[in-house]
């Protein structure tokens, strides 16, 4: 039997039909935080900003092999966290920040990580870190600026996808990992692409789900509207949180994450419930994410262009041909259409697979049976 469940799927919370969870699970995860760029070194961003110190919040599952050859690095989407899998025990949950608690106890890709699952910790050393600029334990706008003792807030420097990839590479150094299978979806897929181009010698295999090689005008338009909803909130303009703006930003984003087929199937008989659903998602989003991190990361997405400084997108993607790569599109994705992902795969000489789903962009988080089947045919 299946059950209707309201789940926090990392970037996107979705009301969906979810299969019952397997009784086989991993031990309760323990999040950790590492200083990767200490004050004596600092972190200079691609756009000329400076952070005196950079920390990343991360979780690991499994054990690094003696040969250090079984690592899998998973990058989360825009509003995701390091909490990839497992369920926090009560002690760990109480130690989390309010935003982390609001994110939830269960990991955002829990159905893919565990005994007998595609990312089995008995076989792999799985690493998941919260991106630089986010609000779930990594250095971001909520962090204290060591120079002032106050949160960075709106003074946090602008980031690019390449900055996010560089921070993640330093985490692998910290963990003693030389090479890894690299997997990412949506924003995480953009980071995965940049990671592979910046550090090709560190990538055993590359998996890009529902992500483009360049953030084009259509996707940027959605981000622009979401940011404007926040920036135009009168409370935000007074220097306060932006509750109405954040709720509206989430609603705008949700429309790009979903597809007409899914809305019609669920709410065709009662269309007003679709509106209620968007309102609910907006209200819930206020409790689990921060406006400044949303602005920083969405702007970073808009900088994404693998061809920048590399002779154009196609020339850049050709550099990936030495890396076994898999690109996964979604047939109903409005945000990053399947043709866009397919085109990138062709230029990279990569395999291409497509998820069939009425759920749009969110399908890479929802259709985990299909994702598992696709990964099973590609991973060692």
From Swiss-Prot:
- Main localization, broad class: cytoplasm
What lineage is this protein's organism placed in?
Bacteria, Thermotogati, Deinococcota, Deinococci, Thermales
What's a single GO CC term here?
cytoplasm
The catalytic activity, as recorded, is:
L-homoserine + acetyl-CoA = O-acetyl-L-homoserine + CoA
The name this protein carries in UniProt is Homoserine O-acetyltransferase
**HAMAP family the UniProt entry points to:** MetX_acyltransf
Can you tell me which residues bind substrate? Answer: 250, 362
Oligomeric and partner information:
Homodimer.
Indicate where this protein resides in the cell: Cytoplasm
| Chaperone as UniProt keyword | no
Q: Which Pfam families match?
A: Abhydrolase_1 (PF00561)
Q: Which family, according to UniProt?
A: Belongs to the AB hydrolase superfamily. MetX family.
Citing just one GO molecular function, the answer is: homoserine O-acetyltransferase activity
Role, per record = Transfers an acetyl group from acetyl-CoA to L-homoserine, forming acetyl-L-homoserine.
* Residue ranges of domain AB hydrolase-1 in the record: 70-366
So what EC number does this one have?
2.3.1.31
Catalytic residues, per the record, are: 186 (nucleophile), 333, 361
Q: List the disulfide bonds.
A: none
Q: In which pathway does it act?
A: Amino-acid biosynthesis; L-methionine biosynthesis via de novo pathway; O-acetyl-L-homoserine from L-homoserine: step 1/1
């Amino acid at each position: 039997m299946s059950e209707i469940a309201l789940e926090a799927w990392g970037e996107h919370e979705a009301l969906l039909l979810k299969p019952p969870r397997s009784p086989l699970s991993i031990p309760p995860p323990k999040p950790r935080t590492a200083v990767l760029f200490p004050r004596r070194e600092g972190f200079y961003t691609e756009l000329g900003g400076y952070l005196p110190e950079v920390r990343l919040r991360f979780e690991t599952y499994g054990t690094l092999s003696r040969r250090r050859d079984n690592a899998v690095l998973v990058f989360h989407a825009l509003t995701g966290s390091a909490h990839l899998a497992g369920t926090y025990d009560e002690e760990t949950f109480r130690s989390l920040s309010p935003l982390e608690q609001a994110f939830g106890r269960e990991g955002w890709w829990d159905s893919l990580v565990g005994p007998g699952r595609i990312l089995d910790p008995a076989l792999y050393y799985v690493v998941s870190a919260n991106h630089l600029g986010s609000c779930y334990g990594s250095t971001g706008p909520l962090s204290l600026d060591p120079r002032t003792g106050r949160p960075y807030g709106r003074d946090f420097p602008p980031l690019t996808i390449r900055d996010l990839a560089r921070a993640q590479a330093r985490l692998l150094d910290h963990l003693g990992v030389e090479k890894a299978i690299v997997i990412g979806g949506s924003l995480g897929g953009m980071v995965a692409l940049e990671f592979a181009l910046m550090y090709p010698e560190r990538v055993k295999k590359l998996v890009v789900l529902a992500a483009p090689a360049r953030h084009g005008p259509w996707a940027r338009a959605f981000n622009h509207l979401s940011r404007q909803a926040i920036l135009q909130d009168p409370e935000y303009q007074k220097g306060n949180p932006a509750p109405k703006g954040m709720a509206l930003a989430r609603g705008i984003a949700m429309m790009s994450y979903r597809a007409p087929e899914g809305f019609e199937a669920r709410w065709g008989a009662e269309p007003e419930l679709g509106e209620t659903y968007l309102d609910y998602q907006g209200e819930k989003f206020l409790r689990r994410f921060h406006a400044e991190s949303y602005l920083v990361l969405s702007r970073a997405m808009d900088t994404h262009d693998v061809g920048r400084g590399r002779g154009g997108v196609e020339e850049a993607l050709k550099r990936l041909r030495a890396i076994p790569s898999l690109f996964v599109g979604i047939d109903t994705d409005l945000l990053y259409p399947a043709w866009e992902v397919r085109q990138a795969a062709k230029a990279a000489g990569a395999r291409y697979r497509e998820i069939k789903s009425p759920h749009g962009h969110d399908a890479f988080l929802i259709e985990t049976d299909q994702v598992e089947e696709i990964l099973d045919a590609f991973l060692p």
